[in-house]
């Protein structure tokens, strides 16, 4: 079938693919390879479905994440919400960035079929689209690191504040901005076929082997490496939670056994030391009765002993709930983006990969769905956010009891301030 000029692929001057089975098109944030059959003619029915689905995802992503951010800002005016809500706010900001700078440009591009913005806008759009993808993954890793510190090293909560969490997220964004720089070189606004008058924003790789190498690097940096890091962190967290669950029947630590030379061991009513993880790993001395010598011994526990004891106490229900929330967000990210990266890596290295236009569009839509469902995950695990929604929409949502469990509502328990 002979192609029209408007539908022709970029040949000698750009792609130099006259003898290769697969050729490159751009329907996502970075290059991908598909068979020449897909390039011959745009499937208008598929394009209409893609535009409709992308529009729905875009609207839900913006509304959902903007609502979560507004609720967090409103709640923070009345009290310190702790680091977990800080990280949820950063995740929502990253998802909004994905919606505005990745989904929206892609939607407009799908509507017009050809890019209409010129050379500068072409490079800028392709750059920020990939920045959004890097940032989404790296902010997610920052959240995992924050939860790892709170659960596995509770004594660090005194120094690991919300400001520290902000710096961690800033580092994630800096990495995203740096790693996306190759997009500025790879993409350009060129005439599809010399003399045709039809321009588009396309990628150009010379030599051609750099195409699969770049796609592989992108998949490693955005998906595979974060997958390994997240799996390692949450494996460690799950081990700590599991060990804590096995000790749930002994939340108080009797320090009488540590008193050398004692012939009698006072009961917990005489003296006890309580390590409150939810309150940042502080130590509560509770002397009563005739346990004066025991109290003096407990007061002389070294910081190292305190940290060892704090790491062995039962985790609060609130912190366990934050682990469930962030783990759900991580699983959602991995599941939604897995088909996208698997199909692109496969197509990059295998000329006969079984992926055509329809399959590529579906994988792209699945990846876009991730930013859309995250706000619902936050609402599912946060009683406080749900209660805020109820207060804003009492008629449609119905009134809920105001006496909720403090630990499940605030992602923490205890009466003293905490940064976790």
UniProtKB/Swiss-Prot annotation:
Keywords linked to the UniProt accession: Cell membrane, Disulfide bond, G-protein coupled receptor, Glycoprotein, Membrane, Receptor, Transducer, Transmembrane, Transmembrane helix
Give the record's family classification. Belongs to the G-protein coupled receptor 1 family. Vasopressin/oxytocin receptor subfamily.
- Where in the sequence does UniProt note compositional bias of the Polar residues kind? 399-420
Q: Which residues are glycosylated?
A: 22
Residue ranges, Extracellular side: 1-54, 105-124, 188-212, 350-360
Kindly give the Pfam families that the UniProt entry links to this protein: 7tm_1
Kindly list the cysteine pairs connected by disulfide bridges: 122-201
Q: Where in the cell is it found?
A: Cell membrane
What SUPFAM superfamilies has UniProt attached to this entry?
Family A G protein-coupled receptor-like
Query: How does the protein associate with the membrane?
Result: Multi-pass membrane protein
What is the protein name given in its UniProt record?
A: Annetocin receptor
Topological domains, Cytoplasmic: 76-83, 146-166, 234-328, 382-420
Tell me, which GO biological process terms does this entry list? cellular response to hormone stimulus; egg-laying behavior; G protein-coupled receptor signaling pathway
């Amino acid at each position: 079938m002979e192609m029209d000029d408007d539908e022709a692929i970029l040949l000698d001057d750009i792609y130099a693919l006259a003898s290769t089975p697969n050729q490159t098109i751009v329907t996502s944030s970075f290059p991908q390879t598909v068979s020449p059959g897909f390039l011959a003619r745009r499937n208008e029915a598929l394009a209409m479905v893609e535009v409709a689905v992308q529009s729905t995802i875009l609207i839900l992503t913006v509304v959902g994440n903007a609502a979560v951010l507004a609720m967090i800002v409103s709640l923070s005016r009345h009290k310190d919400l702790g680091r977990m809500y800080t990280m949820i706010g950063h995740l929502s900001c990253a998802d909004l960035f994905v919606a505005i700078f990745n989904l929206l440009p892609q939607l407009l591009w799908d509507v017009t079929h050809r890019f209409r913005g010129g050379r500068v806008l072409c490079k800028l759009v392709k750059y920020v689209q990939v920045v959004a993808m890097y940032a989404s993954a790296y902010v997610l890793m920052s959240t995992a690191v924050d939860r790892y510190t709170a659960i596995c090293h509770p004594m660090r909560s005194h120094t690991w504040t919300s400001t520290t969490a902000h710096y961690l997220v800033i580092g994630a964004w800096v990495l995203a901005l740096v790693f996306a720089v190759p997009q500025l070189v790879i993409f350009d606004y060129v005439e599809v076929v010399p003399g045709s008058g039809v321009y588009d924003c396309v990628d150009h790789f010379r030599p051609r082997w750099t195409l699969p190498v770049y796609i592989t690097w992108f998949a490693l940096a955005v998906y595979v490496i974060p997958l390994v890091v997240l799996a390692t962190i949450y494996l460690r967290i799950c081990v700590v939670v599991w060990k804590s669950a096995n000790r749930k029947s002994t939340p108080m630590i009797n320090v009488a056994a540590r008193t050398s030379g004692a012939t009698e061991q006072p009961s917990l009513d005489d003296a006890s030391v309580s390590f409150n993880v939810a309150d940042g790993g502080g130590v509560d001395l509770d002397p009563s009765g005739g346990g004066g010598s025991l109290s003096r011994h407990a007061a002389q526990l070294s910081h190292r002993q305190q940290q060892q004891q704090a790491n062995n106490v039962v985790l609060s229900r609130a912190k366990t709930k934050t682990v469930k929330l962030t783990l759900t967000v991580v699983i959602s990210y991995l599941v939604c983006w897995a088909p996208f990266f698997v199909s692109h890596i496969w197509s990059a290295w295998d000329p006969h990969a079984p992926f055509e236009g329809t399959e590529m569009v579906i994988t792209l839509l699945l990846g876009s769905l991730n930013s859309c469902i995250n706000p619902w995950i936050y609402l599912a695990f946060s009683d406080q956010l749900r209660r805020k929604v109820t207060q804003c929409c009492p008629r449609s949502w119905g009134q809920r009891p105001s006496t909720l469990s403090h630990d499940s509502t605030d992602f923490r328990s205890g009466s003293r301030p905490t940064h976790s």
